């Protein structure tokens, strides 16, 4: 596939800093692994939440040129693989990244539904890898360094982001150009990591893998088991009192990375619960300190 011609894919454009400059269709032709491969229907959106994504997109937030660092991050909002918390976790984070000189791309990925995706297990991963591909192939236009492209995810979106970081060679993405799909860094915020019975967020697992996945499938999508010495550096943050996604998800991922000599930083807050970013506005400050060192 030739690099995407963004001039054919731009939905709308603004020039104001902090506002999205473009919304881009992930696929210029048929959507792979879709029950509606030619459909371009908009997703259902209400109250900042997104449902029923048939046509996945990237929403682009670029920093002012005099602040641009060359770094970029693809953001995967959470929502238990049932909805996408698009505004609260996607757009809000993207604006902050742009203010700090980092290009941000909010991913509206396909939510795993049997009615919309042929093999729903890999649908979100295909979309996230395609997003990395698009950012790298169009890096020059956006002032991005191809060697500074990361992935970020919240909650179930953290599972998706960690899947990209550990399974970037494990999903069917049309990549005739040989574009590097490995992210250069990963940022995981109260992430779902494991699909194992003892640790998983059951609703996220059921929505992604179905009600009764076999052991091989559970192991394949337990991203702590997919870590190698080539896994990209990671920043994780979680609250110890998270009652929805056990903090041990972040801890086990941290330990696996550490034992593979992968640079990793973990911030655990004693209180905050799940979704603590909505109650602690300064949560990104240590993240920016970390990312500035990359």
Question: Predicted segment positions?
Answer:
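Bacterial Sec-dependent N-terminal signal peptides
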Residues: 1-23, 294
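N-terminal cap/lid segment of alpha/beta-hydrolase-fold proteins
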Residues: 21-67
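Mobile cap/lid helix-loop segments that gate and shape the active-site cleft of serine hydrolases
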Residues: 44-45, 191-226, 232
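Short beta-strand element of the alpha/beta-hydrolase
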Residues: 69-78
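Catalytic nucleophile-loop/oxyanion-hole region of alpha/beta-hydrolase
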Residues: 85-86, 90-93, 107-146, 278, ...
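Primarily recognizes the serine-hydrolase "nucleophile elbow" in alpha/beta-hydrolase
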Residues: 130-200, 218-219, 223
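Short beta-strand/loop motif that positions the catalytic acidic residue
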Residues: 235-238, 242
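C-terminal catalytic histidine-bearing segment of alpha/beta-hydrolase fold enzymes
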Residues: 247-294
């Amino acid at each position: 596939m030739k690099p995407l011609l963004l001039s054919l894919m731009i939905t709308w454009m603004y020039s104001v800093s902090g506002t999205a400059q473009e919304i881009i269709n992930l696929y210029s032709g048929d959507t792979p692994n879709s029950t509606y491969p030619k459909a371009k229907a908009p997703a259902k959106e209400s109250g900042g939440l997104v449902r029923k994504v048939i046509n996945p997109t990237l929403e682009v937030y670029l920093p002012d040129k005099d602040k641009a660092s060359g770094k970029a991050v693809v953001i995967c909002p959470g929502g238990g693989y049932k909805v996408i918390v698009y505004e609260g976790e996607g757009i809000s984070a993207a604006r902050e990244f742009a203010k700090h000189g980092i290009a941000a791309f909010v991913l509206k990925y396909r939510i795993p539904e049997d009615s919309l995706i042929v093999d729903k297990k890999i649908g979100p991963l295909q979309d996230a890898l395609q997003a990395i591909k698009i950012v790298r192939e169009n890096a020059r236009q956006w002032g991005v360094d191809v060697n500074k492209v990361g992935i970020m995810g919240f909650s179930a979106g953290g599972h998706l982001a960690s899947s990209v970081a550990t399974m970037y060679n494990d999903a069917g993405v049309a990549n005739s150009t040989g574009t590097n799909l490995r992210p250069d860094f990963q940022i995981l915020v109260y992430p779902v990591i494991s699909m194992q019975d003892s640790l998983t967020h059951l609703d996220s697992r059921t929505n992604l893998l179905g009600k009764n996945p076999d052991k091989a499938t559970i192991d394949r999508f337990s991203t702590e088991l997919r870590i190698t010495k080539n896994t990209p550096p990671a920043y994780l943050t979680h609250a110890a009192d998270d009652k929805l996604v056990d903090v041990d998800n972040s801890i086990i991922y941290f330990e696996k990375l550490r034992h593979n000599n992968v640079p990793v930083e973990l911030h655990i807050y004693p209180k905050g619960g799940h979704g603590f970013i909505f109650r602690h506005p300064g949560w990104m400050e240590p993240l920016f300190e970390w990312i500035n060192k990359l």
